[in-house]
Amino acid sequence: MLCAIYKTKRKEGMYLYIEKRGHFDSVPSSLLESFGKPIFVMLFNLAGQKSLINANNEDVQQQIKQNGFYLQMPKQQENLLEQERQYLKHNK
C-alpha cells in the first residue's frame, strides 16, 4: 500500500498519513484545522522493505484502511532538568 505523508509547521514531529496524495476527505475537518496546512513530505510504500522510523508499517496501514488516515504524534522529549530535580528531592 502506497501512502502520502504530510507534516505540519505547528508541531515538530507530527505527521499525517493518508492513502492518496491530496485526498483529505477521510480526515476529520477538526483535525485538519488543528493540523494546519499539510506540507507534503513523500510517498511511502507501507508494504515495501523499508520501515518507518517512528511508527509500525502494519499499524499505519491498518489505521489508514479503517479510518482513512493515521496521525503520528511527536515523541515526548525527556525533561532532564525535571528528572534531576526529582532525583535530588528524593535523595537528600
From Swiss-Prot:
Q: Which residues form a coiled coil?
A: none
Report the HAMAP family cross-referenced here. UPF0745
On the tree of life, the source organism's domain of life is: Bacteria
| Entry's transmembrane regions | none
Q: Which Pfam families match?
A: YcgL
User: PROSITE patterns per the record?
Assistant: YCGL
What is the protein's species of origin? Histophilus somni (strain 2336)
What name does this protein carry?
A: YcgL domain-containing protein HSM_1274
Give residue ranges for domain YcgL.
Answer: 1-85
Q: Which InterPro entries match?
A: YcgL-like_sf, YcgL_dom
